[in-house]
């Protein structure tokens, strides 16, 4: 009987991860406000603006492109609290990747929970910002959202 060969180590790509030097993030809410108990869809966009021909790799899942909702300095909700599968994309000159991220209008904790089990946020003004996990400087401009 032959031995089963050991698996080979995964090779690391020579293509760099995307960061603030080669991508621009933008975040567009579907509306400027919504009611308590409602939800808000955001269009998250990452556009390659680097000069390298090889481009860069970015995880466009909700764990890699993180939507953060804040009230002042208080973090109210983050899209990466619950685990999701990664979705790495190679982007290069002229490429733009868009996806929809939905904030269920609730306050999340540090552990994954169903949105139905979490408290609705109160009326008020919140800020939303998109960032790339592991690259603190790679983020969109914050946008204001009103919960009525």
Where are these predicted regions, by residue range?
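Primarily secretory-pathway and cell-envelope proteins
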Residues: 1-92, 131-132, 136-148
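Beta-strand-connecting loops/turns
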Residues: 37, 123-124
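Signal that preferentially marks extracellular ectodomain short beta-strand elements
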Residues: 100-120
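Short Pro-Gly-centered flexible turn/kink motifs
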Residues: 90-104
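Short linear sequence motifs
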Residues: 81, 96, 119-120
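N-terminal helix-cap/turn-to-beta initiation motif at the start of protein domains
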Residues: 13-15, 117-123
